[in-house]
């Protein structure tokens, strides 16, 4: 059997830490969770956690950033050619992210979610004044619709959310 590379071990450690931290967040208050508790739940040493993350805040920030990077990479490879497909794709990925997002919203860390939205936008925004306004309007709408969707129990499908966004845009503008 081939030996795992350092990069693979690092990725595995990070994934274990993410999973452990989110499991702890389901049952314990954020402030009461220690790096030692995260390490124990992940089955790694405290040093392994600190080699990968400066703090427990950075665990959350890194998790959200990595999610946004994966979505941006998928969007690039999909070559999405219409706003409707873009919105449906984005809400499909965000639907998969709902459990971590609910935890972050419950911790009043919505700004981390907004940073993810902005990061995804930055990969695709055409650098013109008009496009910047357009993208910011669109991302703001996605962000607050996503938060509302989380608060309402995630009842609608990504396709239904896309239709809702299109309806709102038509009525608003």
Give, region by region, the residue ranges found by the protein language model.
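Helical hydrophobic small-molecule/effector-binding pocket
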Residues: 76, 80-115
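Amphipathic alpha-helical packing segments from all-alpha helical-bundle domains
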Residues: 89, 106-144, 159, 167-173
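Residues in the helix-turn-helix
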Residues: 16, 34, 48-50
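N-terminal intrinsically disordered/low-complexity leader segments
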Residues: 1-10
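Alpha-helical structural segments
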Residues: 12-23, 27, 41, 58-78, ...
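Ser/Thr-centered, proline-biased regulatory motifs
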Residues: 31-37
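Short amphipathic alpha-helical segment with a characteristic S/N-K-E followed by hydrophobic residues
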Residues: 32, 55-60
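Short hydrophobic/aromatic patch on the recognition helix
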Residues: 43-53
